[in-house]
Amino acid sequence: MLSELPEVIFKGTEFEEQLSNLTSDSQANKRVYEDYDFKDETSAKPIPTEKKLKVFKKDDNVETLLSALEIQNEKSKQQVEYSFIPLKQDDGDILTSPGDFENASTSPVSDVTYVNTKLVDFISSVLLEENQGLALHQLTLKLINIGESFHSLLPINLPYEPYVIANYVERQLRSYISDTSSSKQSLLSLKNSSNGTVYVSTTLPCPVELKPNITAIDTAERNSYLWGILQPPEPSAEGPFTWNGASSHEGDINNNDTELGLIENPMNLETPKIDYATPHIKESNTPLFTYNFNISGFDGDSCIEKFTPLDALGIKPSPIDVDAHFQPEMLPPLFETFS
């Protein structure tokens, strides 16, 4: 699927200057569109090559890409166009609003990309500073759409309307970039059912369409689909397993004592099974989703994994007041900068 990911096109003089070192003479496998009509896929028109657009190739170096995207203050109003192919449901309708995810298609999708910890670190250290660069949702969209250069933090089925992805980004940052001393948020909450099944719930508003009955993550790359969150660098095989002192027997551990962090895979499972994952709208007025993962393959008492703080993995939560910068109602339905 990743090999089919459309490449990202950035238009405009400023970006041509920034990305000049990424230009490729090869036209092979380029999938670029303009004047895209969401309702009619056949309306996509190739962008003339004479426009000399700069293309992010999926084999470009990640650090080079990130460096090229460090847009300074004077470029904050630069408009950027985002090209993509819409994700369709089984009935042919296109997913364009948060509510669509409740009845999302269970069929395979062709455009999938991943965001890794470098994205979070890059955004928190560069993009959230006062008057720094483009609007957050714009620059983050670019980073998300780089594609295969990013590997595994959250699975994102692309594409969706910019509004939806912008909300995803904004809410994702709320979960990562918070003052853990005052408003402690956990990435995941786990509930241990009576039969030993682990229910993992995330309040990240991922516009993610995890398919029911996905049975295996059978390669290292596919492992990152789920274990990008669940598995830190060195899984532990020791027990009993606790989450900030909460015994694995206590079940619901989503409480005020939790901190930002990842969980370990104590049994070092290589191919866990996702029996189902159901999105829900948590708040009626915001596209905040809760995903419940029924993960089989764990044995009873040890099914609550060990807590690993984010900072132990090199992710430094920022003290920046995200709420003061980005409110859901501020996010525009189209690709434009904040006023």
UniProtKB/Swiss-Prot annotation:
List, alphabetically, the GO terms of the cellular component aspect.
cytosol; nucleus
Superkingdom of the source? Eukaryota
* Protein name (Swiss-Prot/TrEMBL): Uncharacterized protein C29E6.09
